[in-house]
Structures are given as C-alpha cells and as structure tokens.
C-alpha cells in the first residue's frame, strides 16, 4: 500500500512539475499564432515555417507598391513589435573612395565601350524596338550602356516607382527600431566590389535586361497596378509573370551569376538559422528571391522545412 501511495505521489509531483513548462509552451504558441494572424491581416503575401522552437514569417516584398494597392502596413508594424527578431535587406556599403571611382570612371558604367553603338550588339529587331522607344520619348540610347538604358526606361519612362506607398522593409525596420527588436541583415556588399562587377561585365550580358525593360515599357503603365493587385491577392505566379517584375528580375544585380547566387545563398542561410532560433522571426524578403524556380522557398523545402502559405509556382 505504501509503495502504491509513494508511486502515486511521485507521479503527481512529476505532473505538477511539468504543468508550468506545458503552460509556458502553450502561451508561447498562442503568442506566435497571434503574431502570424496579425501579420497576415496586413494583406502582404507571406509564408510561415513552424519549428519546435518557434516560427519564421516570410513576407514576400515587392518594391514600389502602388498607392492603389489596398494593403495595411500598420498591421505588419503591429506584428513586428511582438516579434523576437526581424531580418531585412541591407543597403550596399559605399565609401568616399567608391564615390570618386564612380566619378572618374563614370563613362565605363554609362556608355558602351570602345565608342560602340547599340547596333553593334543588338539584333535588327531589338534595335528597331529601341529606336521606336527613342522616338516616342525623344531620347538617344545609341551609345548608352544597356543597363542604364533599361533603368531609364523603367524608372523614368514607365515611371514604375511613382505614387507608391511604404515598402514592407521600411515598415518592419521602423517598427523594430521603435520596439527595440533585434534587426538582422544579410552581409552588406562593398561598393568597390559592386563597381568592379559592373565594370567587368560584358555589355551583351545586359541585353536580356534591356529586352525585358523594353517589353515592360511597351506594355504601358497598366502593368504597374496589375502587379500590385496580383501581389495583394496572393497570386504569386501572376506577380512573377508580370512584365515589370520580369524586367526587375532580369536586371543587375539579380541576374548576375555571381551576385545573384550570393544574394540567394545569404537569404537561405539566414532563414535556416532563424528556424533554429527560439521565438518568432519576421523576415522581409524580395518576392522574386523567394518564389523563383530554385529560389529560397524551393531551397528551404528541399532542406525539409514545412512551409505554409500561398502557392509560389
């Protein structure tokens, strides 16, 4: 009888000792779920990775969200303030010396080499399309670097970044700073390395970027609102197929083999590390880096992570 009583008391003490730990786990899970729900109510497409130690929220960001796109940044801000850490993109690190290099070597980045002209590199059809845009906008792109021409078409002629609202990165960064939440970033690229990469690139390597930029500009400004609308309704494949998103993804640095691979490796590694951390991580990642074929989501899935959210391909 005494042994039965002692065994019963021992079992009860174990159960009582486990109760606080179980309560803590339950409270933590409820808190993480609340953060996820609040973040999802912002309207931005996102994915979650649940692990034994916490949750990672991956917010798929597009740059230059049109003001006509009905999303709610304040809800993402609210969720961020309750997170344990955030991961956001890092700006390149330019030194004063890099600025001087750009000034003295500017022509190497803005002009075709050896006094070359566009027809030296483009097919007759490509050159004819460029000529039509030159006539429409009263511009001379004949000597210009294809990358600079593409940027001019997208930013000034298509004017894709006019009348925009806050990017998700800006929202999360400001919220994290106000709430004193840890901010993690991928390693910053040095300005010197970026300038060297651009200077050494074959002009022909930027032709796909130019072609995509011409296609987006020819399609007209309706694609800007269409891209934002697809993003808001979580139609990720449609966003990725939008001519503007295609153009942005075809241009430097994303399309550069060396830089593009490093960018994707950095994001994949940081998110995998976050999945092994305790608590909730909010990561704002460029949508194209997440959702492209063999992108971050594909890589994480291949590593065995269970990913919940909208279809990305």
State where each predicted segment sits.
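Bacterial N-terminal signal peptides that target proteins for export
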Residues: 1-9
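Active-site-proximal flexible loops/turns
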Residues: 9, 68, 293
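Hydrophobic helical h-region of N-terminal Sec-dependent signal peptides
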Residues: 9-15
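N-terminal signal peptide c-region/cleavage motif recognized by signal peptidases
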Residues: 18-19
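Structured, acidic catalytic/metal-binding patches in enzyme active sites
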Residues: 28-39, 43-255, 259
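A cross-kingdom marker for long, charged
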Residues: 253-313
């Amino acid at each position: 009888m005494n042994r039965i009583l002692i065994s019963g008391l021992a079992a009860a003490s174990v159960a009582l000792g486990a109760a606080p730990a179980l309560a803590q786990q339950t409270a933590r899970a409820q808190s993480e779920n609340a953060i996820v729900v609040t973040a999802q109510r912002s309207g931005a497409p996102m994915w979650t990775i649940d692990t034994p130690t916490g949750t990672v929220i991956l917010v798929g960001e597009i740059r230059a969200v049109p003001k006509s796109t009905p999303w709610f940044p304040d809800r993402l801000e609210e969720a961020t303030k309750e997170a344990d850490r955030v991961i956001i993109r890092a700006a390149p690190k330019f030194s004063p010396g890099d600025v001087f290099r750009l000034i003295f070597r500017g022509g190497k980045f803005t002009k075709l080499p050896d006094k070359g002209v566009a027809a030296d590199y483009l097919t007759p059809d490509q050159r004819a399309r460029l000529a039509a845009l030159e006539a429409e906008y009263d511009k001379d792109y004949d000597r210009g670097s294809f990358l600079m021409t593409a940027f001019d078409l997208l930013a000034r002629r298509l004017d894709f970044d006019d009348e925009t609202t806050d990017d998700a990165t800006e929202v999360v960064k400001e919220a994290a700073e106000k709430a004193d939440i840890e901010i993690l970033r991928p390693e910053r690229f040095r300005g010197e390395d970026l300038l060297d990469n651009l200077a050494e690139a074959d002009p022909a390597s930027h032709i796909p970027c130019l072609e995509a930029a011409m296609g987006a500009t020819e399609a007209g400004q309706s694609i800007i609102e269409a891209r934002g609308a697809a993003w808001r309704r979580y139609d990720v494949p449609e966003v990725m197929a939008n001519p503007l998103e295609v153009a942005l993804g075809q241009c430097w640095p994303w399309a550069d083999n060396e830089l593009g691979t490093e960018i994707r490796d950095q994001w994949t590694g940081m998110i995998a590390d976050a999945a092994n951390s305790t608590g909730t991580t909010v990561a704002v990642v460029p949508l194209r880096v997440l959702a492209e074929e063999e992108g971050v989501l594909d890589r994480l899935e291949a590593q065995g992570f269970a990913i919940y959210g909208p279809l990305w391909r």
